[in-house]
C-alpha cells in the first residue's frame, strides 16, 4: 500500500512530522506536540574564536561496525578534522596542518590533521567517529596508523537527553595550530 491509495496510519490519516497521538496520552501531560529548540546541556557552548562544536558522524568506512575490518579503513577512513575555509583563514590554518584539540568540558587533549572543506559550516568542525585516535598501549607495527586523529568520545561528557536517553556525540573543543 502506498499513501496515495490508502491513508497513513496516523490519527489524521495524513503524514505527520510529529504525531498528535502523543497529545492524547496520559503520559503527555504538559508535553507540547510541536518541537521546540532547547540548548543542549551536554557540553559547554563555544565562546572564543578558537572554540568549536565538533559534530561527529559515521559512514560505511568509519564506524564501530567496521572495526572488525580495521586494515581496509587505513585506506578508506578519514582521520582528519574538517574545518570550514572561513575559520581556517581566520586562524591561519591550512590544509594538512596539525592542530591540538583540548576539551572544554574534560581535561583531554589530542592532535589531528585538518581537512579544509566547504562541507562543514563555519563555526563548527566535523570528525568521523570511530575512525582514529586509538590509545591502546600495545599495537602491532603495521597498525600504528590507528593512533592518527582523535576519537571525539574522549571529549564527551556522557550526559544523556532526559526525554529519550540518547547520548550526545557532539562535543566542544579549543584548538590551536601546532
Regions flagged by a language model, labelled:
Residues 1-71:
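Long, low-complexity segments enriched in small/aliphatic residues
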Amino acid at each position: 500500500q502506498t499513501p496515495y491509495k490508502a491513508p497513513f496510519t496516523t490519527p489524521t490519516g495524513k503524514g505527520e512530522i510529529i504525531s498528535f497521538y502523543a497529545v492524547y496520552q496520559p503520559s503527555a501531560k504538559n508535553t507540547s506536540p510541536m518541537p521546540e529548540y532547547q540548548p543542549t546541556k551536554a557540553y559547554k557552548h563555544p565562546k572564543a574564536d578558537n572554540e568549536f562544536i565538533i559534530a561527529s558522524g559515521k559512514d560505511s568506512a568509519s564506524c564501530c561496525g567496521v572495526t572488525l575490518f580495521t586494515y581496509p579503513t587505513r585506506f578508506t577512513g578519514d582521520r582528519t578534522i574538517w574545518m570550514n575555509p572561513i575559520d581556517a583563514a581566520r586562524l591561519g590554518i591550512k590544509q594538512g596542518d596539525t592542530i591540538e584539540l583540548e576539551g572544554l568540558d574534560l581535561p583531554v587533549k589530542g592532535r589531528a590533521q585538518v581537512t579544509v572543506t566547504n562541507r562543514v559550516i563555519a563555526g563548527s568542525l566535523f570528525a568521523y567517529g570511530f575512525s582514529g585516535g586509538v590509545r591502546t598501549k600495545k599495537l602491532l607495527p603495521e597498525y600504528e596508523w590507528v593512533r592518527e586523529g582523535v576519537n571525539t568520545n574522549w571529549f564527551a561528557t556522557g550526559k544523556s537527553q532526559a526525554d529519550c536517553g540518547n547520548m550526545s556525540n557532539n562535543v566542544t573543543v579549543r584548538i590551536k595550530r601546532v
